[in-house]
């Protein structure tokens, strides 16, 4: 039923044709069940294991590698002679890499549990309904409830469907609907129509929502929505419809993969075409087909050379190490790619309650009357320190600590706070914190009594458990609570009837009252000044109310409670406690004692974190279910707004936002820093608008209501104390629920991206070198300098270790003074592309040069001419151009070993170059990252291993080198450091200043 909250009880019952006392007939139930289905959320069909595996092979680079492996396998099958076994090594290794990558990918996807499944934990098992087949209430499975059912709910129940209240069977009905609306305190419900068809869920005070909990009271209602039509069902549908966006890094790597695959294809075709003239060379036995296959193998080698096989593994390792560092800072990352996304966060949309604030209501101000003369009066105003439930804090007057027992008014105020109260403090030994037992507002008063210590109780030597309620216990020993007049909407107050534990002539029974100031003060005839009682004049009342109004607005927006007593109440037997309508009569002729102002205080460290965000170019937006006044006040306190800043067009309620045109809504999201009284749909809409500006949005949330927005935003951040749904829909969980942890995680994300950029560039320059090497050998007609199995070894192992170690580079000192990077910024810009192309060309030329040196100039080499080397395929005993040359020399393992050793050594030098993008090695020496030094040593050790330990040289088709050859390797390799230092010098002195200008 649409807009059931706007209809009267009679209209709703009439719509379903149901009587409140008898319920639906079984015939009606059957029809309604057929129409609306079961009252449960359908499970989402997940992807099958096969679908997940196939998905892992949708990446272009992976497909090229797969193709290369298949071709290598087919070619190896037709290989003859000694090389048959080694020919199978290459396709086997490629397949091994692909399988390992696929396993990691599938595991990660399976690990991101389904948030939609977690929603099911909010579905109650059973419900209590009235139906015509039985005279009394019956318990049935919640999934069998249908729209139109008459349901009974009582304290402790989980609401089984969306229900329009028809009657309340207790003085009040309080509902904890925080999981759905984010409201920090339980909500009092009523049965009157709410005439606004566009009311947000918080304002539908006559509705109960599926999955919420009854905190107090008992009521009846008619079911108006079940299953996916409930508010929680709508959240489920929204989550199903939300497609997970790929992270900026994933998009970059996708683009890079596409570009690389095109370049690889072109180069492979070019190499093959260049050598068409050599297809008939004698070495191929004059067979054109065998020649074509030989050059096809070289093209496959090129593909293997061009793809950085180690990149996925290195990225995963770097992100995993980043998550460990973040976990130490209380940020638990659930999705690895999001670690890097944090680095380009440009907007943080934060919940107020519990994230920016402590979610621990705390009294920060109070006043009692000091002096009254006619219509004029003066107040004693006090401030209270401490912003958590810990009973630690001081009471200050004029910024100086005071002893509360010196003020009679404060003694009475503390007595009311302690007795007119059903809450307590509890010390949680496991967590080492004080927690509330009961309502947040009442716990704030309990905590205030402990801080005031009006009877000067000796607190030293008490354990933390004993300390929790020590001062309250003293007051409760003096007077006994006989009964409570529960809170009701009409009088906006509650009271307790107390009698002294030691009756005497002077001590009489009293009623202590607390409630909304306007309601309580209207019923006060007197006012307490010290220990005396003075009539309340209109002037005094006006003065008191003006102070309360000032506290309730202004910079604090405190929640104020008036405290009063009834010194001569009726006796218990004279009161009718069955009818709550009479309670207001018993709470008249009151004496006003004082007022307390409380708020959910901002976390101490949040203001500095907001300032840090501003320096880092990150906009912080507060999004809350609370009212606008409170939200703006907290924004001012933590620095989201300046103290006197005009918040017009910067702060909106959900209603104000809805009333704007779509273009005005878009503009609002461009400037706004505060949204109050919002619903889940608003959060998702705000995220959509921000994404349309290419903002990278981090969204926090803890309730079921936050899940769609958490899933939609680039970075969903759930609270450690939040619901399972929020956690499973998010990328990150804050173990300490603290906003400052987000800022620390953003800083870590920026550092990780910078390091990632370094090692991606490092790996790519290595691949450019390998491609140039193979292209040069093919273009010059030289024998192969590097074969695929060697390239795989270099790409995976030798380069992989230093690349991983580059992930440990220390972050730049000014990392949080720069604006967020543009997610569209390419991994490799124009200048850097030139730089890595230049380095890559040197690597390729040096590798080919090392092989050529052994053929042409080495002492132990054949010393052939350049012509002979470049036409080696024409080498035959009867060819006069090759007189005196043993043709078998062109298959010697030495040139390959020289080429591989130069490639590995240059790559180690390159790793040192990658310590910093533009800083010289003199400014940033290798020991700045000791992991890098260790990984270079390990990589070189592994290279020696394949050179000198049998049977590895046979597999890699290489052979041990002597000292002269090693010296030549170093001479060819070391200039790469000088070359990169020159390029860095140009960047530092000529390019960076130009960019900054």
Curated annotation (Swiss-Prot):
Ca(2+) 1 binds at residues 304-305, 307, 309, 795, 799. Residues 788-997 are annotated as: Interaction with TMEM64 and PDIA3. It catalyses: Ca(2+)(in) + ATP + H2O = Ca(2+)(out) + ADP + phosphate + H(+). Belongs to the cation transport ATPase (P-type) (TC 3.A.3) family. Type IIA subfamily. It comes from the Eukaryota. Disulfide bonds join 875-887. Gene3D superfamilies: Calcium-transporting ATPase, cytoplasmic domain N, Calcium-transporting ATPase, cytoplasmic transduction domain A, Calcium-transporting ATPase, transmembrane domain, HAD superfamily/HAD-like. Ca(2+) 2 binds at residues 767, 770, 798-799, 907. Its cofactor is Mg(2+). One of its GO terms (molecular function) is metal ion binding. This is Sarcoplasmic/endoplasmic reticulum calcium ATPase 2. It comes from Canis lupus familiaris. The modification Phosphoserine is found at residues 38, 531, 580, 661, 663. The gene is ATP2A2.
């Amino acid at each position: 039923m649409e807009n059931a909250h706007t209809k009267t009880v009679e209209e709703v019952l009439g719509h379903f044709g149901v009587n409140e006392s008898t319920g639906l007939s079984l015939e009606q139930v059957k029809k309604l069940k057929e129409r609306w289905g079961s009252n449960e959320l359908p499970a989402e069909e997940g992807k099958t294991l096969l679908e997940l595996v196939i998905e892992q092979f949708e990446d272009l680079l992976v497909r090229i590698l797969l193709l290369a492996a298949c071709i290598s396998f087919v070619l190896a099958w037709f290989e003859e002679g000694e090389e048959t076994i080694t020919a199978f090594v290459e396709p086997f290794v490629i397949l091994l890499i692909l399988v390992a990558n696929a396993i990691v990918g599938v595991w990660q996807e399976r690990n991101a549990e389904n948030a939609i499944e977690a929603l099911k934990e909010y579905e109650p098992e059973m419900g209590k309904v009235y139906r015509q087949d039985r005279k009394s209430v019956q318990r049935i499975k919640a999934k069998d409830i249908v729209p139109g059912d008459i349901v009974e709910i009582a304290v402790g129940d989980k609401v089984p469907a969306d229900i329009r209240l028809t009657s309340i069977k207790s003085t009040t009905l309080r509902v904890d609907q925080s999981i759905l609306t984010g409201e920090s305190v339980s909500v009092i419900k009523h049965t009157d129509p709410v005439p606004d068809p566009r009311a947000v869920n918080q304002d539908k005070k006559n509705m109960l929502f599926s999955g919420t909990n009854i905190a107090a009271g008992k009521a009846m209602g008619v079911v108006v929505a079940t299953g996916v039509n409930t508010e929680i069902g709508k959240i489920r549908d929204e989550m199903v419809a939300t497609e997970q966006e790929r992270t900026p890094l994933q998009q970059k790597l996708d683009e890079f993969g596409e570009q690389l695959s095109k370049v690889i294809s072109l180069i492979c075709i070019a190499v093959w075409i260049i050598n068409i003239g050599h297809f008939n060379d004698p070495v191929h036995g004059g067979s054109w087909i065998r020649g074509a296959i030989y050059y096809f193998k070289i093209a496959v080698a090129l593909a293997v050379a061009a793809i950085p096989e180690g990149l996925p593994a290195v990225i995963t390792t770097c992100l995993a190490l980043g998550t460990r560092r973040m976990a130490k800072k209380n940020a638990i990352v659930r999705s690895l790619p999001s670690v890097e996304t944090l680095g380009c966060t440009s907007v943080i949309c934060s919940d107020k309650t519990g994230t920016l604030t402590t979610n621990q209501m705390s009294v920060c101000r109070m006043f009692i009357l000091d002096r009254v003369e006619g219509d004029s009066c003066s107040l004693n105003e006090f401030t209270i320190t401490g912003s958590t439930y810990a009973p630690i804090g001081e009471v200050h007057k004029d910024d100086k600590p005071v002893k509360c027992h010196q003020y009679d008014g404060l003694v009475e105020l503390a007595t009311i706070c302690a007795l007119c109260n059903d809450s307590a403090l509890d010390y949680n030994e496991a967590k080492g914190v004080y927690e509330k037992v009961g309502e947040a507002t009442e716990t704030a008063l309990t905590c205030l009594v402990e801080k005031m210590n009006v009877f000067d109780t000796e607190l030293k030597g008490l354990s933390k458990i004993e300390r929790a309620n020590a001062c309250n216990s003293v007051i409760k020993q003096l007077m006994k609570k006989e009964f409570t007049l529960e809170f009701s909407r009409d009088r906006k107050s509650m009271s307790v009837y107390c009698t002294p534990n030691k009756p005497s002539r002077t001590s009489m029974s009293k009623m202590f009252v607390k409630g909304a100031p306007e309601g309580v003060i209207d019923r006060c005839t007197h006012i307490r000044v010290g220990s005396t009682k003075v009539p309340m004049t209109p002037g005094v009342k006006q003065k008191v109310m003006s102070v309360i109004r000032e506290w309730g607005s202004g910079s604090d927006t405190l929640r104020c409670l008036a405290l009063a007593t009834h010194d001569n109440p009726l006796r218990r037997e004279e009161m009718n406690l069955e009818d709550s309508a009479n309670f207001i009569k018993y709470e008249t002729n009151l004496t006003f004692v004082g007022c307390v102002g409380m708020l959910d205080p901002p976390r101490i460290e949040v203001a500095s974190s907001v300032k840090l965000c501003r320096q880092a170019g990150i906009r912080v937006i507060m999004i809350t279910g609370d009212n606008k006044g409170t939200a703006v006040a907290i924004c001012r306190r933590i620095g989201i707004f300046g103290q006197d800043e005009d918040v017009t067009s910067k702060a909106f309620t959900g209603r104000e936002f809805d009333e704007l045109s779509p273009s005005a809504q878009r503009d609002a999201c461009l400037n706004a820093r505060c949204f109050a009284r919002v619903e889940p749909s608003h959060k998702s809409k705000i995220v959509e608008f921000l994404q349309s500006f290419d903002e990278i949005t981090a969204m926090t949330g803890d309730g079921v209501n936050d899940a769609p927005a958490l899933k939609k935003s680039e970075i969903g951040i759930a609270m450690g104390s939040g619901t399972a749904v929020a956690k499973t829909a998010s990328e990150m969980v804050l173990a300490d629920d603290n906003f400052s942890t987000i800022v620390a995680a953003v800083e870590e994300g920026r550092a990780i991206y910078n390091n990632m950029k370094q090692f991606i560039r490092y790996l790519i320059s290595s691949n450019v070198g390998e491609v140039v090497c193979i292209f040069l050998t093919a273009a010059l007609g030289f024998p192969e300098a590097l074969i695929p199995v060697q390239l795989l070894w270099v790409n995976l192992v030798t380069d992989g270790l230093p690349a991983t170690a580059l992930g440990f580079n220390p972050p730049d000192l000014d990392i949080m003074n720069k604006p967020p990077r543009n997610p569209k910024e390419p991994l490799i810009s124009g200048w850097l592309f030139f730089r890595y192309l230049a380095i890559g060309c040197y690597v390729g030329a040096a590798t080919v040069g090392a092989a050529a040196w052994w053929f042409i100039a080495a002492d132990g080499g054949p010393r052939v001419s350049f012509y002979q080397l470049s036409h080696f395929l024409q080498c035959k005993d009867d060819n006069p151009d090759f007189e005196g040359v043993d043709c078998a020399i062109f298959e010697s393992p030495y040139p390959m070993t020289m080429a591989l050793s130069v490639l590995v050594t240059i790559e180690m030098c390159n790793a040192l170059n990658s310590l910093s993008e533009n800083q010289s090695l003199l400014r940033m020496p290798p020991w700045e990252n000791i992991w890098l030094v260790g990984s270079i040593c390990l990589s070189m050790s592994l290279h020696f291993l394949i050179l000198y330990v049998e049977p590895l040289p046979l597999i890699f088709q290489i052979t041990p080198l002597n000292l002269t050859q090693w010296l030549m390797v170093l001479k060819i390799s070391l200039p790469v450091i000088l070359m990169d230092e020159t390029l860095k010098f140009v960047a530092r002195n000529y390019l960076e200043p130009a960019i900054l200008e």
